[in-house]
């Protein structure tokens, strides 16, 4: 059946025991005039996306399986070092001015309100998932040379049935050359957003994600805003999502601005990135200088979990090192800035000693 040359043509046909609709549209889109997303992203639901359109990863490996981001012990450590600052978690969002609301409470009511605020903060601090980048889709279904040159535009055919998960949704593209292929991930994301709009997401990515605009955002210490927009706009296993997150983490590490993400849902992902890259020195020094030695110890423990064959993990195991001693072992073995870490620890211990003497 030949496609009718109209902006939107619909076909209905019987497919098995259910009715399905396939939609054919020209693969063109107009860029939205707005530059930034106006809607604040909602708390991210953690879950592994289904990838039935890409080739399955090989299961089973002769190597010892390393801890994954969603492992219970990993999540416990990352949640612990993230911290819980209610003032920061519930900081005012940029929105139209409204008169403040004041309430008179008894002590019991205040304690209950605080408890509810803590529970709400834990929901807001739920970490977005960290996934491997999805494999590209390069499946060609047919080469119809007889159609070559009959059209100058691509046509996208989409199954818009409501009972199909988006990862399983059948979407194909007819090229002007006559090639019929499966849509790429980027094409799928755009088309799905057209027919099934997601709040806070656009069909075309905002210009804020261009490198020159990201540098401006970083210079204004708006790293958390960039990551919030990124979570709203992209799928967690997309190349752009991973790229923006890594760029943001590297800028924070370069300038030592770890506090910008502390007590946000992005701190755990940042710590996980540094541990995987064996670049925890800067974060470790920052934690020690902020009197967060317990968090620094947890960070080194996580490092040893991911790199159990390293010299630091081996020596810590032999010495049964704990607490500050665990950090010292790391500083003497695998740290890139070991002298700075030892100096920070020395300063911390001197302060603790002076406080103990004063009391």
Curated annotation (Swiss-Prot):
The modification Phosphoserine is found at residue 54. The modification N6-acetyllysine is found at residue 210. One of its GO terms (biological process) is mitochondrial translation. Residues 40-65 are annotated as: Disordered. Keywords: Acetylation, Mitochondrion, Phosphoprotein, Ribonucleoprotein, Ribosomal protein. The keyword Ribosomal protein applies. The keyword Transferase does not apply. GO terms for cellular component: mitochondrial inner membrane; mitochondrial small ribosomal subunit; mitochondrion. Disruption phenotype: Heterozygous MRPS22 knockout mice are fertile and show no overt abnormalities. Homozygous MRPS22 knockout results in embryonic lethality. It is found in: Mitochondrion. Its main location: mitochondrion. InterPro entries: Ribosomal_mS22. One of its GO terms (molecular function) is structural constituent of ribosome. Pfam families: MRP-S22. Component of the mitochondrial ribosome small subunit (28S) which comprises a 12S rRNA and about 30 distinct proteins. Belongs to the mitochondrion-specific ribosomal protein mS22 family. This is Small ribosomal subunit protein mS22.
């Amino acid at each position: 059946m030949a496609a009718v040359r109209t902006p939107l043509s619909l076909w209905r046909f019987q497919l098995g025991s259910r009715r399905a609709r396939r939609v054919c549209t020209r693969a063109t889109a107009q860029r939205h005039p707005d530059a930034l997303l106006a809607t604040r992203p909602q708390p991210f639901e953690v879950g592994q996306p289904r990838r039935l359109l890409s080739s399955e990863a090989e299961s089973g490996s002769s190597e010892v399986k390393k801890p994954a981001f969603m492992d219970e012990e990993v999540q416990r450590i990352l949640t612990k070092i993230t911290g819980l600052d209610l003032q920061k978690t519930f900081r005012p969002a940029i929105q139209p001015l409204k008169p403040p609301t004041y309430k008179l409470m008894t002590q019991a009511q205040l304690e209950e309100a605080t408890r509810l605020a803590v529970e709400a903060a834990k929901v807001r601090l739920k970490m977005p998932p960290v996934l491997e980048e999805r494999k590209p889709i390069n499946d060609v279904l047919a080469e119809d040379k007889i159609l070559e040159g009959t059209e100058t535009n691509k046509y996208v055919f989409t199954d818009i049935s409501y009972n199909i998960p988006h990862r399983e949704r059948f979407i194909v593209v007819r090229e002007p050359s006559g090639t019929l292929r499966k849509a790429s991930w980027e094409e799928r994301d755009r088309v799905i957003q057209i027919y099934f709009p997601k709040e806070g997401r656009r069909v075309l990515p905002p210009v804020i994600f261009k490198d020159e605009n990201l540098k401006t955002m970083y210079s204004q210490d708006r790293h958390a805003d960039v990551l919030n927009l990124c979570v709203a706009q992209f799928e967690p296993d997309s190349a752009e999502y991973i790229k923006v997150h890594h760029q943001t983490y590297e800028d924070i590490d370069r300038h030592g601005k770890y506090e910008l993400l502390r007590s946000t849902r992005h701190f755990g992902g940042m710590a996980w990135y540094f541990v995987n890259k064996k670049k925890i020195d800067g974060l470790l020094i920052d934690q020690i200088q902020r009197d967060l030695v317990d968090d620094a110890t947890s960070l080194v423990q996580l490092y040893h979990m991911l790199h159990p064959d390293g010299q630091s993990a081996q020596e810590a195991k032999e010495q049964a090192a704990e607490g500050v001693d665990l950090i010292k072992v790391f500083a003497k073995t695998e740290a890139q800035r070991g002298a700075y870490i030892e100096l920070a620890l020395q300063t911390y211990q001197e302060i603790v000693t002076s406080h103990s003497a004063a009391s």
